Regions:
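Solvent-exposed beta-strand/loop surfaces, strongest in extracytoplasmic domains of secreted
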Residues: 1-249
Length: 249
């Protein structure tokens, strides 16, 4: 890396002098920044080579949501160096290194590092567990909602971008009473969630759309005469024997 400056000799002549920078990289006191300084001070037009700082994501974003939590770089070196590549390790710098193209996503501590001129700066941060929310789930109502004497169960699965959810228990309510979703009527669905690797536990989680209605069966009864089917008029009331069935029952 070269710099240039105008030099005036003893005779008053001016000429342009090229300067070869010799950059020294120094780690900041907080361990998060690297500063470049030219140590070849002879005829150096500017010894300041700038600095670069690695910074953790904003604290309010460090809650699991299925997205990457990348560290960022602030400021730039003026030495002609490319922006350093950020690498990530699990834990406080002693754990496994994440593969290229992978970033902190799941709950846990991570260390993000950059290296320039043999000097490494780093920052450690931690992703916290999230509280389960209805948006983390996909609700599907039962396929058949006509009464048939069988329980009607909804399907609730975690969203495709979500991992580390605890076991889910699905419950059905009419008003405030937990019931089996079998008879005709309106049902509200609630879930309880156990602790998971990325989520806290939750109870009675629901959404206004987590509901369905079982409709009563509508069918014509079948009426058949049974026993004696031949009668002689007597002027008296005659009551035949009949059998009434619905759907063969």
């Amino acid at each position: 890396d070269r710099g240039y400056m105008v030099i005036k000799d003893a005779q008053g002549n001016l000429y342009l002098s090229a300067h070869q920078h010799s950059w020294q990289y120094t780690l900041g006191a907080d361990g998060k920044s690297i500063t470049a300084t030219c140590v070849n001070t002879t005829n150096c037009p500017n010894i300041d080579g700038g600095s670069v700082t690695i910074k953790a994501p904003e604290e309010n974003t460090l809650i699991y949501d299925g997205s990457n939590k990348k560290a960022i770089l602030e400021n730039k070196l003026l030495t002609g160096e490319k922006d350093p590549t950020i690498s990530y390790t699990v834990g406080n710098g002693q754990g496994a290194t994440l593969p290229d193209g992978s970033y902190p996503t799941n709950v846990g501590a991570y260390t993000a590092s950059i290296t320039v001129g043999g000097v490494t700066a780093s920052v450690t941060y931690e992703i916290q567990k999230a509280d389960p929310a209805a948006k983390n789930f996909v609700f599907t109502a039962p396929g058949s909602l006509t009464y048939d004497g069988m329980a009607k169960t909804a399907d609730i699965k975690t969203a495709t971008n979500i991992t580390g959810m605890g076991d889910v228990m699905v419950k059905y309510y009419q008003g405030e009473t937990e019931v089996q979703p079998m008879n005709a009527g309106e049902y509200k669905v609630k879930i309880s969630v156990a602790y998971g690797s990325n989520f806290n536990a939750a109870s009675d989680l629901t959404d206004e759309n987590w509901a369905f209605r079982i409709t009563p069966i509508i069918t014509e009864p079948t009426v058949e005469l049974s026993g004696n089917t031949t009668y002689t008029y007597t002027g008296e009331r005659i009551t035949p024997d009949v059998t009434v069935t619905i759907d063969g029952r």
